[in-house]
């Protein structure tokens, strides 16, 4: 299975899991396409809370890099949409989510997450609870 196919499979799996948790979600893959604008791989919304997820997968290894141009593009998308940007990182069988501001910026302007930072990220259920904790509850919702 090619890396592109593995990435697409992972993105579809995430979309399905988010949908099962009540999110409105779309997959917007752009890698390998001729798109000039950069968009995150997954856009998910729940009760007005928007999360944007750039997915990266590694069989093993200790770092995940995002090139400067791609990072700046998806950060701009996040700013325009009002969404919160995350890196979804799958290393071996673990799937973790990091807020994009947790990534370190290199001297060349690229972004990197080392293995320790990735391991400290949220798992899927923690990500869902994080989003649900941001949903505003009004008095009407309790009646």
UniProtKB/Swiss-Prot annotation:
EC main group: hydrolase
Essential cofactor(s): Mg(2+)
Pfam families, sorted: Hjc
Documented EC number(s): 3.1.21.10
Membrane-spanning segments: none
Binding-site positions, Mg(2+): 11, 41, 54
Transmembrane recorded as keyword: no
Catalytic activity line of the entry: Endonucleolytic cleavage at a junction such as a reciprocal single-stranded crossover between two homologous DNA duplexes (Holliday junction)
Site (Transition state stabilizer): 56
GO BP term, pick one: DNA recombination
Ubl conjugation among keywords: no
Catalytic machinery residues: 31
Any one GO molecular-function label of the UniProt entry: magnesium ion binding
Cofactor: record remark: Binds 1 Mg(2+) ion per subunit.
Gene3D superfamilies the UniProt entry points to: 3.40.1350.10
Keywords in alphabetical order: DNA damage, DNA recombination, DNA repair, DNA-binding, Endonuclease, Hydrolase, Magnesium, Metal-binding, Nuclease
Subunit annotation: Homodimer.
Family the entry assigns: Belongs to the Holliday junction resolvase Hjc family.
HAMAP family: HJ_Resolv_Hjc (MF_01490)
PANTHER family named in the record: HOLLIDAY JUNCTION RESOLVASE HJC
Role: A structure-specific endonuclease that resolves Holliday junction (HJ) intermediates during genetic recombination. Cleaves 4-way DNA junctions introducing paired nicks in opposing strands, leaving a 5'-terminal phosphate and a 3'-terminal hydroxyl group that are ligated to produce recombinant products. Redundant function with Holliday junction resolvase Hje.
Leftover remarks: A second Holliday junction resolving enzyme, Hje, probably with different substrate specificity, exists in this organism.
Protein name: Crossover junction endodeoxyribonuclease Hjc
Protein species of origin: Sulfolobus acidocaldarius (strain ATCC 33909 / DSM 639 / JCM 8929 / NBRC 15157 / NCIMB 11770)
Higher taxonomy: Archaea, Thermoproteota, Thermoprotei, Sulfolobales, Sulfolobaceae
């Amino acid at each position: 299975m090619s890396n592109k196919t593995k990435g697409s499979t992972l993105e579809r799996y995430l979309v399905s899991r988010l949908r099962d948790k009540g999110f409105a979600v779309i997959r917007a893959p752009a890698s390998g396409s001729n798109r000039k604008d950069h968009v995150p791989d997954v856009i998910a919304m729940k009760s007005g809370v928007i999360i944007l997820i750039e997915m990266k997968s590694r069989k093993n290894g200790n770092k995940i890099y995002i090139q400067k141009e791609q990072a700046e593009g998806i950060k701009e998308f996040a700013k325009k949409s009002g969404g919160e940007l995350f890196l979804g990182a799958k290393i071996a069988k673990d799937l973790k989510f990091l807020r994009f501001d947790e990534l370190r910026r290199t001297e060349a302007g690229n972004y990197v997450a080392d293995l320790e930072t990735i391991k400290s990220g949220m798992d899927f259920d923690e990500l869902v609870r994080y989003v649900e904790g941001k949903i505003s509850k009004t008095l009407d919702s309790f009646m």
